[in-house]
């Protein structure tokens, strides 16, 4: 006799939790909480030291594959002193978030912040900004988050 075990599905729980967090504490507090969760996740699984952005991208994609959280493309923009981070296939928590379906995006901000700053010679005091205009205009595939990581003193 074959017994099929259903794996737990946390979708309903996460959707309800996302709505409650947003209602109870508001968007700003929620975003900071999720960034901190991302930093914690980044501490639990860290990339090895990488000498190039290309090698770091390969290592980050290997870590993302472990947790089933999509893929990333990194591009160093030396003229802006920034790192362009394009994350594709972010898991969704239903339609939660702004734009819709991007509730977990602040987790990525914390995650990439931890991972990138763990590298030798990386940004120290940094800020991560999302390109929500591109996300809103559907200029990128659904579940794609575009972020820029800059040294805080040169951020606008």
Curated annotation (Swiss-Prot):
Keywords per UniProt: Cellulose biosynthesis
GO BP: cellulose biosynthetic process
Record-level Gene Ontology MF annotations: identical protein binding
Domain of life: Bacteria
Biological or metabolic pathway of the protein: Glycan metabolism; bacterial cellulose biosynthesis
Keyword Ligase: no
Pfam family, one: Cellsynth_D
Function: May have a major role in the perfection of crystallization, involved either in the pore structure itself or in the organization of the pores within the linear array of terminal synthesizing complexes (TCs).
Protein name (record): Cellulose synthase operon protein D
Protein encoded by which gene: acsD
